[in-house]
Protein backbone atom coordinates (compact mmCIF):
# COMPACT_ATOMS: atom_id res chain seq x y z
CA UNK A 1 0.00 0.00 0.00
CA UNK A 2 2.85 2.37 0.81
CA UNK A 3 4.46 1.58 -2.55
CA UNK A 4 1.21 2.26 -4.42
CA UNK A 5 0.69 5.55 -2.59
CA UNK A 6 4.18 6.83 -3.37
CA UNK A 7 4.01 5.83 -7.05
CA UNK A 8 0.41 6.65 -7.89
CA UNK A 9 1.60 8.93 -10.70
CA UNK A 10 3.01 5.97 -12.64
CA UNK A 11 0.99 3.97 -15.16
CA UNK A 12 1.54 1.16 -17.62
CA UNK A 13 5.09 0.15 -18.49
CA UNK A 14 6.55 2.83 -16.22
CA UNK A 15 4.81 1.12 -13.30
CA UNK A 16 6.06 -2.30 -14.44
CA UNK A 17 9.65 -1.06 -14.36
CA UNK A 18 9.16 0.50 -10.94
CA UNK A 19 7.66 -2.67 -9.44
CA UNK A 20 10.59 -4.77 -10.67
CA UNK A 21 13.05 -2.17 -9.39
CA UNK A 22 11.28 -2.01 -6.02
CA UNK A 23 11.49 -5.79 -5.66
CA UNK A 24 15.07 -5.75 -6.96
CA UNK A 25 14.26 -8.39 -9.56
CA UNK A 26 16.60 -8.31 -12.55
CA UNK A 27 15.20 -9.78 -15.75
CA UNK A 28 18.23 -11.15 -17.57
CA UNK A 29 17.88 -11.32 -21.36
CA UNK A 30 20.76 -11.55 -23.80
CA UNK A 31 21.14 -8.91 -26.51
CA UNK A 32 20.97 -11.70 -29.07
CA UNK A 33 17.62 -12.86 -27.72
CA UNK A 34 16.23 -9.33 -27.75
CA UNK A 35 17.03 -9.18 -31.47
CA UNK A 36 14.30 -11.79 -31.99
CA UNK A 37 11.68 -9.16 -31.08
CA UNK A 38 10.81 -7.20 -34.25
CA UNK A 39 10.68 -3.42 -33.88
CA UNK A 40 7.46 -3.19 -35.89
CA UNK A 41 4.48 -5.30 -36.89
CA UNK A 42 2.02 -7.57 -35.08
CA UNK A 43 3.43 -10.33 -32.91
CA UNK A 44 2.11 -12.99 -30.54
CA UNK A 45 4.46 -13.94 -27.70
CA UNK A 46 3.82 -17.32 -26.06
CA UNK A 47 5.46 -18.38 -22.81
CA UNK A 48 5.43 -20.87 -19.99
CA UNK A 49 3.87 -19.70 -16.72
CA UNK A 50 6.16 -20.79 -13.85
CA UNK A 51 5.58 -18.19 -11.13
CA UNK A 52 2.38 -16.16 -11.53
CA UNK A 53 1.94 -12.39 -11.85
CA UNK A 54 5.69 -11.88 -12.09
CA UNK A 55 5.74 -13.74 -15.42
CA UNK A 56 3.52 -11.13 -17.02
CA UNK A 57 5.49 -8.22 -15.58
CA UNK A 58 8.76 -9.78 -16.74
CA UNK A 59 7.58 -10.28 -20.32
CA UNK A 60 6.05 -6.81 -20.51
CA UNK A 61 9.43 -5.47 -19.40
CA UNK A 62 11.32 -7.68 -21.87
CA UNK A 63 9.26 -6.61 -24.89
CA UNK A 64 9.41 -2.96 -23.81
CA UNK A 65 13.19 -3.05 -24.23
CA UNK A 66 12.45 -3.07 -27.97
CA UNK A 67 8.94 -1.60 -28.34
CA UNK A 68 6.18 -0.33 -26.09
CA UNK A 69 3.00 -1.30 -27.98
CA UNK A 70 2.52 -4.43 -25.88
CA UNK A 71 -0.37 -5.97 -23.93
CA UNK A 72 -0.77 -9.22 -22.03
CA UNK A 73 -3.76 -11.57 -21.89
CA UNK A 74 -4.30 -12.07 -18.18
CA UNK A 75 -6.67 -13.39 -15.54
CA UNK A 76 -9.69 -11.16 -15.02
CA UNK A 77 -8.91 -11.07 -11.29
CA UNK A 78 -5.93 -8.81 -12.06
CA UNK A 79 -7.98 -6.20 -13.91
CA UNK A 80 -8.49 -4.30 -10.64
CA UNK A 81 -4.80 -3.28 -10.69
CA UNK A 82 -5.66 0.10 -12.17
CA UNK A 83 -2.10 1.40 -12.78
CA UNK A 84 -1.47 -1.62 -15.01
CA UNK A 85 -4.95 -2.04 -16.51
CA UNK A 86 -3.99 -0.39 -19.81
CA UNK A 87 -1.60 -3.30 -20.42
CA UNK A 88 -4.13 -6.06 -19.72
CA UNK A 89 -6.72 -7.85 -21.82
CA UNK A 90 -8.69 -9.77 -19.17
CA UNK A 91 -10.06 -13.28 -19.68
CA UNK A 92 -11.87 -15.75 -17.43
CA UNK A 93 -9.28 -18.47 -16.92
CA UNK A 94 -11.57 -20.39 -14.58
CA UNK A 95 -14.52 -20.46 -16.97
CA UNK A 96 -12.49 -21.78 -19.87
CA UNK A 97 -14.17 -19.54 -22.47
CA UNK A 98 -13.01 -16.15 -23.68
CA UNK A 99 -15.62 -13.39 -23.81
CA UNK A 100 -16.32 -11.89 -27.21
CA UNK A 101 -15.28 -8.44 -25.97
CA UNK A 102 -11.85 -9.77 -25.01
CA UNK A 103 -11.44 -11.49 -28.38
CA UNK A 104 -12.29 -8.22 -30.11
CA UNK A 105 -9.66 -6.41 -28.03
CA UNK A 106 -7.03 -9.01 -28.96
CA UNK A 107 -7.80 -8.78 -32.66
CA UNK A 108 -7.85 -4.99 -32.62
CA UNK A 109 -4.50 -4.81 -30.87
CA UNK A 110 -2.89 -7.14 -33.41
CA UNK A 111 -4.56 -5.39 -36.34
CA UNK A 112 -2.99 -2.19 -35.01
CA UNK A 113 0.38 -3.98 -35.31
CA UNK A 114 0.85 -4.44 -31.55
CA UNK A 115 2.45 -7.22 -29.50
CA UNK A 116 0.20 -9.59 -27.54
CA UNK A 117 1.57 -11.84 -24.78
CA UNK A 118 -0.15 -15.17 -24.04
CA UNK A 119 0.36 -17.70 -21.27
CA UNK A 120 -1.48 -20.55 -23.03
CA UNK A 121 -1.56 -22.79 -19.95
CA UNK A 122 -3.99 -20.34 -18.37
CA UNK A 123 -2.59 -20.95 -14.90
CA UNK A 124 0.70 -21.35 -13.05
CA UNK A 125 2.81 -24.51 -13.54
CA UNK A 126 1.96 -27.41 -11.23
CA UNK A 127 3.64 -30.62 -10.04
CA UNK A 128 3.22 -33.58 -12.40
CA UNK A 129 4.77 -37.03 -12.67
CA UNK A 130 7.31 -35.50 -15.04
CA UNK A 131 8.16 -32.62 -12.71
CA UNK A 132 6.87 -29.04 -12.58
CA UNK A 133 5.01 -28.44 -15.84
CA UNK A 134 2.44 -26.16 -17.43
CA UNK A 135 -1.00 -27.63 -17.99
CA UNK A 136 -1.92 -28.47 -21.57
CA UNK A 137 -1.82 -25.25 -23.56
CA UNK A 138 -5.09 -23.82 -24.84
CA UNK A 139 -4.97 -23.49 -28.67
CA UNK A 140 -6.63 -20.07 -28.85
CA UNK A 141 -3.38 -18.28 -29.69
CA UNK A 142 -2.86 -20.56 -32.71
CA UNK A 143 -6.33 -19.75 -34.06
CA UNK A 144 -5.66 -16.04 -33.62
CA UNK A 145 -2.23 -16.22 -35.26
CA UNK A 146 -3.65 -18.17 -38.18
CA UNK A 147 -6.65 -15.91 -38.66
CA UNK A 148 -4.62 -12.69 -38.69
CA UNK A 149 -1.39 -14.17 -40.12
CA UNK A 150 0.65 -13.08 -37.12
CA UNK A 151 4.05 -14.65 -36.31
CA UNK A 152 4.63 -16.38 -32.98
CA UNK A 153 7.58 -15.79 -30.67
CA UNK A 154 8.25 -18.54 -28.08
CA UNK A 155 9.72 -17.53 -24.73
CA UNK A 156 10.89 -19.59 -21.77
CA UNK A 157 10.98 -18.11 -18.26
CA UNK A 158 13.52 -19.98 -16.15
CA UNK A 159 11.95 -19.90 -12.69
CA UNK A 160 9.95 -21.88 -10.17
CA UNK A 161 7.86 -21.34 -7.06
CA UNK A 162 8.46 -22.62 -3.53
CA UNK A 163 7.94 -26.20 -2.38
CA UNK A 164 5.24 -24.90 -0.04
CA UNK A 165 3.30 -23.52 -2.99
CA UNK A 166 3.57 -26.77 -4.93
CA UNK A 167 2.47 -28.76 -1.89
CA UNK A 168 -0.54 -26.47 -1.48
CA UNK A 169 -1.67 -27.17 -5.06
CA UNK A 170 -2.06 -30.82 -4.10
CA UNK A 171 -4.15 -29.98 -1.04
CA UNK A 172 -6.30 -26.91 -1.65
CA UNK A 173 -6.78 -24.62 -4.68
CA UNK A 174 -7.84 -21.85 -2.29
CA UNK A 175 -4.64 -22.04 -0.26
CA UNK A 176 -2.46 -22.16 -3.38
CA UNK A 177 -4.22 -19.07 -4.73
CA UNK A 178 -3.53 -17.21 -1.48
CA UNK A 179 0.13 -18.22 -1.62
CA UNK A 180 0.54 -17.18 -5.25
CA UNK A 181 1.08 -13.45 -4.66
CA UNK A 182 3.53 -14.26 -1.89
CA UNK A 183 5.66 -16.08 -4.44
CA UNK A 184 6.49 -12.84 -6.25
CA UNK A 185 7.77 -11.19 -3.07
CA UNK A 186 9.75 -14.32 -2.31
CA UNK A 187 11.83 -13.54 -5.40
CA UNK A 188 13.10 -10.20 -4.06
CA UNK A 189 16.77 -9.48 -4.77
CA UNK A 190 17.09 -12.13 -7.46
CA UNK A 191 17.55 -12.63 -11.18
CA UNK A 192 14.89 -13.93 -13.56
CA UNK A 193 16.44 -15.44 -16.70
CA UNK A 194 14.35 -15.16 -19.87
CA UNK A 195 15.18 -17.06 -23.06
CA UNK A 196 13.65 -15.91 -26.35
CA UNK A 197 13.40 -18.32 -29.27
CA UNK A 198 13.13 -17.71 -32.99
CA UNK A 199 9.99 -16.40 -34.66
CA UNK A 200 7.58 -18.91 -36.13
CA UNK A 201 5.84 -17.54 -39.22
CA UNK A 202 2.11 -18.32 -39.23
CA UNK A 203 2.26 -19.99 -42.66
CA UNK A 204 5.14 -22.26 -41.70
CA UNK A 205 3.12 -24.40 -39.30
CA UNK A 206 -0.50 -23.38 -39.32
CA UNK A 207 -3.39 -23.36 -41.72
CA UNK A 208 -5.82 -20.44 -41.89
CA UNK A 209 -8.73 -22.85 -42.25
Question: Which residues are covered by each model-predicted region?
Answer:
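Hydrophobic beta-strand scaffold residues
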Residues: 27, 70-72, 116, 152
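A cross-family acyltransferase "interaction/gating" segment
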Residues: 115, 128-206
Amino acid sequence: QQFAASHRHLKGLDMVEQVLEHLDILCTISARDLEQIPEHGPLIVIANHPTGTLDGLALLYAVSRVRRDVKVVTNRMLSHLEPLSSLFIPVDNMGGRTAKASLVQMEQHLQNAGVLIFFPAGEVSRPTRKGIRDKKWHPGFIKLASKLRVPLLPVHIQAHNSLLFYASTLVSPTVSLLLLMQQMFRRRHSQLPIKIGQQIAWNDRFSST
